[in-house]
């Protein structure tokens, strides 16, 4: 018979208890891990909601603000500079409400090539939020992703660009999980889906009862950015909005990728029923020397309807697109380009529906939808013009 002293027995018991407690804590830690599959189909695991975040595109502030509208910048330790340079109107709104936005370190400019891994690692980030594709690092930047994850920075991919009407909901739910804001994410998703149904369901009913001609649409992207006529979107981005409302995108059969060029001769031959331009100009462009400014269409934060209309008139005049039948017949419209990269895109979908099928959607009010999105889910007020119809009478005066 083996005898064990009381002292050794106590040590043994303590060891066993410690071992068991370690196992319990390990199991609890495992159970509390946040585990999701991102939109690059990668398994992403966090031990706790992210507290130090890198934004691969600072335009994702729209999404983060939905989850934390009172303090959207609190956990952001670094971001690309795209919002300030590409959408200065919105940046100025944030700057006025949250002056500390200027103090957030920039980890790059407006491209993946400018993204600084070294800068990110110096900021002790625990999560980097990237788009599957876009201005910042994407899913194809395997080496960069590997560098970050080896250094302990978890990478999460979201998407408002490639398949926006499917992936906006998925992206917001992912962000809700990793940031510990599921309730806010669910509230947004509920509103978003209800507003999408206001397009999808009436359109399906109308098509079933009275099959109608799908309008041929030319989607003119980033008007004024280059002299060459005319950049367009064929797949994803705003082309996906067009697909969702049953529009016939005339670029789809001519452009093999997501974006490309259709020349003016082709447009004059095909003569789309509807012309939609995307506007990359901002209020700040109006403050500069107009004579030296490209013919941007100006829309977005801080832009009046009259200024938007004047910029649209100028862009049409300088591009020679006034000869399009759609323009002459009063079926020419412009919309804020950056809808394609934010979860506020549902307002743009409703606008497209109303432009293509005005009778079916006579009672739909996209402006009210956008107002609600800002009132419920954004930290800054809706203040500006985000779409406009070309005033053909003004053009002939």
Residue ranges and their predicted role:
Residues 1-5, 19-22, 266:
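A general, composition-driven signal for non-globular sequence regions
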Residues 11-23:
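Bacterial N-terminal signal peptides
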Residues 2-14:
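Bacterial N-terminal signal peptides that target proteins for export
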Residues 27-397:
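N-terminal ligand-binding lobe of clamshell/alpha-beta domains
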